[in-house]
Regions:
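RNA-contacting regions in translation and RNA-metabolism proteins
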Residues: 1-136
Length: 136
């Protein structure tokens, strides 16, 4: 049988609620490559944002926490390069990773333009540069 505890919902901040799934089989909700996580996050966000005007933070078996830690480690040399050259970009990032990286880079560089761009293949990445220049 499938063992999953009832989800807990709590206030994360004034604009965000935290929805947590745990239990022995909670990781099955994440799916291969996080596809189920993305789908569930998308469904919950669209419903809750439309009905209540709130954002969501979905945590399943520490998936989001682990993703945040991984992205923070990845961003260390990226941030260093941007500090040295004044501009830079990330690799192609997917799903929740682009959101986490965007928040981190905006916090690290509040004086710069930090935005999401789409590559030729449709993958998304983040660019950081000065506001007053044409964005490449």
């Amino acid at each position: 049988s499938f063992t999953l505890e009832a989800p807990t919902v709590s206030k994360y901040d004034d604009e965000t609620i935290l929805i947590e799934f745990s239990g022995e089989d909670a990781a099955l909700l994440i799916g291969k490559e996080g596809y189920r996580y993305k789908a569930l996050s998308y469904l919950l966000y669209n419903w809750i944002n439309l009905k209540y005007g709130l954002n969501i933070r979905l945590e399943i078996a520490e998936f989001l926490k682990n993703q945040e830690e991984m992205i923070e480690k990845y961003l260390v040399p990226v941030i260093e390069r941007i500090r040295n050259s004044g501009r830079g970009q990330t690799k192609i990032l997917d799903g929740v990773l682009i959101k986490i990286a965007l928040e981190s880079l905006r916090a690290a560089f509040p004086e710069k333009y930090v935005g999401i761009k789409s590559g030729r293949e449709g993958g998304k990445f983040i660019v950081v540069n000065d506001f007053n220049r044409k964005n490449a």
